[in-house]
Amino acid sequence: MQAAVASKTNISLKGSTEIVTEFFSYSINTILFQRGLYPPESFTRVAKYGLPILVTNDQSLKDYLDNVLKQLSEWLLSGDVQKLVLVITDIVTKEVLERWVFDVTTDIPKEGEAPRQKPEKEIMNEIQAIIRQITASVTFLPLLPNACTFDLLVYTSKDLAVPQKWEESDPKFITNSQQVKLRSFTTTIHKVESMVAYKISND
C-alpha cells in the first residue's frame, strides 16, 4: 500500500520574507480592485494561489507599490515590521472610512537552529483563504463614496530610521467603527493576522 507524504519545505528567513511580501502585493491589489479605488479596466487578471487575482497595470501605482514593498521586504528581513495598514479615506471630507490591518509577528531562527519546515501547499492554502475573504468583503462593507484615496502605513520598531520619501504618520483610526477579523497565515517565521475596520454609517 502506498502512503501519500506531504512534502515539507525548508523555510528560510529570506524565503519567508518573499512569501509575505508577495502576499502583501496581491492583497493590496485585491483590496484596491474590490473597493473600486481605481477603474476596473486598469487591472489585469493573473493566476496566483489557485485563484484569479486582479493586479494593477497603472504604471504610477505600480511604481508606488514597488517602492513600498521593496522597503517593506527589507524591514521584514530584519524583523522590524509590526504591522501593515491600508487606509481608505474620503477625499472630500478627509474622513477615514476603512483600515485593513495586517499584524506581523516575527520569530527569526537562531543561529545553528534546524531549518523550519512547513508544506508550501499549506501556506498557499492559508493565504488563499485570506484572499477569498478580502474578495468576499464587498458583501458586508458599506459602499464607498466616489472619490476615495488610500495610504499605506508600516508600523516598525521604534528605533528604526525613517527613509527619505517616507514620513511619520498618525494611526488614522476610524471613529465609530466595526471590526471584522479575517484569517491568518504563518510561514513558521512570519505570522500575519488580518482584519478590516470600517466606519458605521450614522444614517
Swiss-Prot record:
Transmembrane segments: none
Gene Ontology biological-process annotations: cell division; cheating during chimeric sorocarp development; mitotic spindle assembly checkpoint signaling
Keywords (A to Z) from UniProt: Cell cycle, Cell division, Centromere, Chromosome, Cytoplasm, Kinetochore, Mitosis, Nucleus
InterPro entries named among the record's database cross-references: HORMA_dom (IPR003511), HORMA_dom_sf (IPR036570), Mad2-like (IPR045091)
Domain of life: Eukaryota
Subcellular localization: Nucleus; Chromosome, Centromere, Kinetochore; Cytoplasm
Segments forming domain HORMA: 14-196
Keyword Nucleus: yes
A Pfam family recorded for this sequence: HORMA
Region feature Required for assuming the closed conformation and for interaction with cdc20, mapped onto this chain: 194-203
A cellular component annotation (GO) from this entry: kinetochore
Biological function: Component of the spindle-assembly checkpoint that prevents the onset of anaphase until all chromosomes are properly aligned at the metaphase plate. Required for the execution of the mitotic checkpoint which monitors the process of kinetochore-spindle attachment and inhibits the activity of the anaphase promoting complex until all chromosomes are aligned at the metaphase plate.
Quaternary state and interactors: Interacts with cdc20.
Entry's family note: Belongs to the MAD2 family.
Domain observations: The protein has two highly different native conformations, an inactive open conformation that cannot bind cdc20 and that predominates in cytosolic monomers, and an active closed conformation.
Protein name: Mitotic spindle assembly checkpoint protein MAD2A
Native species: Dictyostelium discoideum (Social amoeba)
